[in-house]
Amino acid sequence: MGIASEVFGDALPVAERYAAFLGTAGVERGLIGPREVDRLWERHLINCAVVSAAVPPDARVVDIGSGAGLPGIVLAIVRPDLRITLLEPLLRRTTFLTECVEMLDLGNVEVLRARAEEVAGRLSMDVATARAVAPLERLAKWALPLLRPGGELLALKGERAAAELDEAGPVLKQHGVRGTELLQVGRGMVDPPTTLVRVIAGGGEDGGRRRRAPRRAKGSRKRSS
């Protein structure tokens, strides 16, 4: 809990309430496996919280296939400056997410029941996040239409991150992305560190919303599109 306190700071009590809800209602409703309860903090909450290092200040974030709220709710807890939309098509999951948002009093979060394809053209977000939703090749097709020009997809990936990025090359080229990057965040806080694939959307200059970029995470590897 020492690392959790460092990561969440004054928001730790809110994170603790969320962890308790995940470990009870989340398991009962099939959103979290029973074996995950003992490792909720390291494998799920802290693993997601460190993603905040890669998110610009005051960003509008859409969490695609939010499920139990990972990473969307965690980001909302640790970064109250963010405005987060939890995008989830299944009713039982949106019900769970709505209960979480109300219980934790997260005024910077909205829950939207829809598929990404259904809201393409309606959303123009700064950042899209996704965890364990789909291979990057498919995820990019869903996420990029939800981003403003110059917006970023931050996909939480495992050991196949580099391979998925290579496999998604043709799709990313088709969508005219500006660049891609592999990042590792949370070194020293989670083992292994959280691996992100960052994809920068193409389009106009930047949609009129210039933002101060966060410091590049240690261990990042940049690629050109």
Model-derived features with residue positions:
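Class I SAM-dependent transferase core
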Residues: M1-V62, I77-V78, R92-V109
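Flexible, active-site-adjacent loop/turn segments at secondary-structure boundaries
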Residues: R29-G30, D38-R39, A68, R131-A134, ...
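Residue-level recognition of conserved structural "scaffold" positions that shape functional pockets
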Residues: V37, G72-V74, L165
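Conserved beta-strand/loop positions that form the S-adenosyl-L-methionine
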Residues: I64-S66
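Conserved SAM-binding loop of SAM-dependent methyltransferases across substrates and taxa
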Residues: A68-D81
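S-adenosylmethionine
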Residues: R79-S225
